[in-house]
């Protein structure tokens, strides 16, 4: 077993402090395989270690507060962004966040790849629309490309539910969603109607709504609704999930973050999703969206005003690290 020197020093210190101890420091250090000078240095810096431990614990409490915000698990990046949005903002190095999470055993579940299971087809199909989007998910700007899909939610207690969503490919904002216990196409049409009702002003004739080749999106009623709403339609190639990858990824993260185990009814499911959507749009910060939430990022793109103050790295400290020869000494 590879025991750190600091742990050996601590054992030696506790042994020396025992009233019935008959062993001297030299013998204990030799038996532990450490030097006397190293042990005395350990004793000399004891106060500094205690202060560091106290500081670490206080910082960990701040990290824990950010981690527990709204009840959804967060990784180091999400905690870093949450700290920036606190009042007042807390600036903490992400390496320190990772170190303290590891030190105190705070972990965020990492989503594992899972093959996407297709839902049972429920209605007749019509024409397949060309893949106009061609995976250009984010290059066209906000409200230009909308992604839509359906996923199922099951926990063994509540009825099986189906969730239809429409998200902005650029800002990742959830613009419309509907939950249903049936695969009948009405709830998919209602999702589009909600989109038009709440976001018509920000849409244009160039706005593209992209989906897979599910029967709902090939139905005559859906395609007519899209045309009547003055939107354009695009579809992924058959059996190619990569053509709608951001939407697939979105559902994966959603199921990771929402705890459906306590839901006993459709209403419980609805409440859980409504709370998460509000959190996701307003307080779930995304690293690739300049550390902003989807709604904040949309406002930033519209106004050009960045809402956060992020400290720049200490250039002097960086230069000291680069030119410090002790950092680059290697043992033979």
What does each model-found stretch correspond to?
Residues 28-29, 39, 63, 79, ...:
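Mobile genetic element proteins and their domesticated derivatives, centered on retroelements
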Residues 202-217, 290-294:
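Acidic/histidine-rich, metal-coordinating catalytic segments
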Residues 119-120, 211-213, 219-220, 235-255, ...:
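RNase H-like two-metal-ion nuclease catalytic core shared by retroviral integrases
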Residues 3-7, 29, 38-141, 294, ...:
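Basic, flexible linker segments flanking DNA-binding modules
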Residues 227-231, 255-332:
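C-terminal domain-tail junction helix/linker
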Residues 13-42, 103:
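Structured, non-catalytic alpha/beta "coupling" segments that mediate domain-domain communication
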Residues 90, 94-165, 190-194, 198-199, ...:
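Mobile-element integrase/transposase regions
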Residues 1-24, 53:
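Residue-centric detector for conserved, function-critical "anchor" positions
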């Amino acid at each position: 077993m590879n025991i750190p020197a600091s742990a050996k020093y601590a054992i030696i210190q506790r042994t020396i402090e025992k009233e019935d101890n008959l062993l001297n420091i030299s013998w204990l250090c030799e038996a532990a395989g450490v030097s006397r000078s190293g042990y005395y240095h350990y004793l000399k810096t004891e106060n500094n270690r205690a202060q560091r431990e106290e500081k670490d614990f206080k910082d960990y409490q701040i990290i824990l507060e950010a981690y527990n915000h709204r009840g959804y698990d967060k990784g180091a990046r999400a905690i870093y962004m949450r700290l920036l949005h606190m009042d007042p903002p807390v600036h903490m190095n992400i390496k320190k966040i990772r170190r303290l999470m590891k030190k105190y055993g705070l972990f965020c579940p990492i989503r594992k790849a899972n093959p996407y299971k297709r839902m049972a087809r429920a209605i007749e199909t019509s024409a397949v629309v060309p893949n106009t989007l061609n995976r250009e998910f984010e290059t066209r700007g906000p409200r230009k490309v909308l992604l839509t899909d359906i996923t199922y939610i099951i926990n063994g207690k509540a009825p099986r539910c189906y969730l239809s969503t429409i998200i902005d490919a650029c800002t990742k904002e959830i613009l419309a969603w509907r939950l249903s216990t049936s695969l009948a196409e009405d709830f998919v049409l209602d999702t589009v109607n909600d989109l038009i009702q709440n976001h018509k002003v920000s849409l244009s004739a160039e706005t593209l709504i992209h989906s897979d080749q599910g029967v709902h999106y090939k139905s005559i009623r859906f395609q007519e609704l899209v045309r009547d709403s003055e939107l354009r339609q695009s579809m992924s190639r058959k059996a190619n999930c990569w053509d709608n990858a951001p939407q697939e990824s979105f559902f994966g993260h959603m199921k990771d973050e929402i705890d459906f185990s306590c839901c006993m009814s459709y209403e419980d499911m609805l409440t859980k999703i409504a709370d998460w959507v509000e959190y996701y749009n307003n307080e779930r910060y995304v690293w690739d969206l300049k550390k902003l939430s989807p709604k904040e990022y949309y406002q930033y793109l519209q106004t050009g005003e960045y809402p956060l103050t992020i400290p720049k790295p200490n250039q002097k400290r960086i230069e000291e690290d680069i030119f410090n020869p002790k950092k680059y000494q290697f043992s033979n």
